[in-house]
Amino acid sequence: MAKELIGNDWDKVLDPVFASDKYHELHNFLKEEYSNKRIFPDMYHIFTAFKLTPFNKTKVVILGQDPYHNPGQANGMSFSVMPGTPLPPSLRNIYKELYDDVGVRPVNHGYLKKWADQGVLLLNAVLTVPYAHANGHQGKGWEDVTDTAIKALSERGKVVFILWGRFAQNKIPLIDQSKNFIIKSSHPSPFSADRGFFGSRPFSRCNTALLNFGETPIDWQLSETVNKSDLA
């Protein structure tokens, strides 16, 4: 097996990718990028989503595109930001729908680790991004890693995939819909939230699907505050 990069069962699932020439190229590219540019998240948090939510514990996938590209935001989990960082507009809209859907009180931080700890894989399709350059690492090799993860989860089955926006929905061909459940709508971005995201009730629908799979539903309520000991 290639060197353990994650430290749980994802290493075995992703080993064929980590051992590939394509990943070796990505690794060398990232070494150069991190040496010469500001890249987010920091290299210690690239695999946070996988570390917090092991393969066999994953019940839900919320798929993002790539990390936030401004300082202090990206933490290795899709849509999540570090405590103390202003909420990005998409996350504000997620909280609004969360309240309208299941009555969850909005909190003043955007740190979503509590969801990850319950089996929600907060996965970006591309795991790194240069400062102020959205999609700057697209097509460099991360898609091999994350597509492999999606396909492996699909094959295992009983996973709810929450796909917001066209980019995420382009991954539908990777998912066996006879064994899994897909929830899709427009993206929560202010540019598209009014075109189908608001009112789509993804959180209650997710929990209904989990119950149908015989799984425990997600407690979507986040803690009011985040302690240092809670940080990944």
Curated annotation (Swiss-Prot):
Cellular component (GO) terms are: cytoplasm
Instruction: Quickly give the catalysed reaction.
Output: Hydrolyzes single-stranded DNA or mismatched double-stranded DNA and polynucleotides, releasing free uracil
Which Pfam families does the record cross-reference, listed alphabetically?
A: UDG
- The reply to whether Cytoplasm figures as a keyword in the UniProt entry is yes
Active-site annotation: 66 (proton acceptor)
Q: Name one GO molecular function term.
A: uracil DNA N-glycosylase activity
What Enzyme Commission number(s) appear in the record?
Answer: 3.2.2.27
The protein's matches in Gene3D superfamilies, at most eight in alphabetical order, are given as:
Uracil-DNA glycosylase-like domain
Q: Where in the cell is it found?
A: Cytoplasm
Q: This protein's superkingdom?
A: Bacteria
Keywords from the named record: Cytoplasm, DNA damage, DNA repair, Hydrolase
Recorded hits in PROSITE patterns, A to Z, give: U_DNA_GLYCOSYLASE (PS00130)
Determine if DNA damage is one of this entry's keywords.
yes
Q: What InterPro entries does this protein's entry cite?
A: UDG_fam1 (IPR002043), Ura-DNA_Glyclase_AS (IPR018085), Uracil-DNA_glycosylase-like (IPR005122), Uracil-DNA_glycosylase-like_sf (IPR036895)
> Biological process GO terms, please?
base-excision repair, AP site formation via deaminated base removal
Q: What does this protein do?
A: Excises uracil residues from the DNA which can arise as a result of misincorporation of dUMP residues by DNA polymerase or due to deamination of cytosine.
| Similarity annotation | Belongs to the uracil-DNA glycosylase (UDG) superfamily. UNG family.
Specify the protein name: Uracil-DNA glycosylase
**Organism annotation:** Lactobacillus helveticus (strain DPC 4571)
